[in-house]
Design a protein with these regions (language model features):
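Bacterial N-terminal signal peptides that target proteins for export
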Residues: 1-2
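C-terminal segment of classical bacterial N-terminal signal peptides
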Residues: 6-17
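Mobile, glycine-rich extracellular loop/lid and propeptide segments
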Residues: 19-169
């Protein structure tokens, strides 16, 4: 049976005995919001020792300083309102941060906004409808985006149902 490198890594983790895995809590960070989508997707940047967290409650990207993992602190919070609707995902590679933002309505084409690891805006590009997941290529030169293309609710007349797509750039 042939396995890919990623598959081999996955299998070696799955096959490891439970006793070999030991997770300990190092620290916590609270947004101060309860029962809201205040922290959904996160991405770590080793260069800056920062954690980038999508905050759906405030439609922002929260940047946490985790150089001391026992005491994470809020470094910056970036409003994503200028880029469209709801924040959906974040990815980081070599100090470059990409954030997927849906349009309003979600059936329109969304945006990927780029920032440096301090939160300074660099650029933004239009992608397909409802960009939901994004990841940098291993060499960090491109971003792959999964655009869900979900329809509006049935109560909308006429119903708009955009195609799902993949964007790369």
């Amino acid at each position: 049976m042939a396995l890919t490198v990623a598959g081999g890594v996955f299998l070696s983790i799955v096959e490891a005995p439970a006793q070999a895995l030991n997770l300990n809590r190092l620290g916590t960070y609270s947004t101060g919001l309860f029962n809201q989508t205040a922290a959904e997707i996160s991405a770590y940047d080793a260069l800056s020792q920062r954690l980038f967290v999508t905050n759906g409650a405030t439609n922002s990207l929260d940047i946490l300083n985790i150089s001391n993992p026992q005491a994470p602190t809020l470094f910056n919070s970036i409003s994503l309102n200028p880029y469209g609707g709801a924040v959906n995902s974040v990815s980081v590679k070599n100090g470059l941060v990409a954030v997927a933002v849906a349009a309003t309505p979600k059936t329109n084409n969304g945006t990927v906004a780029f920032f440096d690891n301090n939160g300074t805006p660099l650029n933004s590009v239009t992608v397909g409808a409802l960009p939901d997941m994004l990841i940098f290529t291993p060499d960090g030169t491109k971003v792959l985006v999964a655009n869900e293309g979900e329809p509006e609710p049935i109560s909308t007349n006429p119903v708009t149902n955009p195609e799902g797509s993949i964007s790369m750039g």
